[in-house]
Amino acid sequence: MQGVQEQIEELQTKLAFQELTVEELNQEVIKLNQLVAHQQHQIQLLIGKLQAIEPSNMATQAEETPPPHY
C-alpha cells in the first residue's frame, strides 16, 4: 500500500507544478497579447502619419531619375 500512496503523492506534486506552470504561461500570454495590441496601435498611428504626408514632398515614379545602370 505504501507504493500506491507514494505514487498518489508524486502525481499530486506533479499536478501542482503543472498548475503553477500553466498559470505562469497564461500570464505570459496575457503580457504578449497586450504587447501585440500596443504594437498594432503604434503601427496604425504610423500609417496615419505616412498617409498625412503631403504628396508634393515625395517624387512620383515618373519624376524619379533612373538608376545609373539604365
From Swiss-Prot:
Disulfide bonds: none annotated. Pfam families: SlyX. InterPro entries: SlyX (IPR007236). Belongs to the SlyX family. This is Protein SlyX homolog. It comes from Shewanella oneidensis (strain ATCC 700550 / JCM 31522 / CIP 106686 / LMG 19005 / NCIMB 14063 / MR-1).
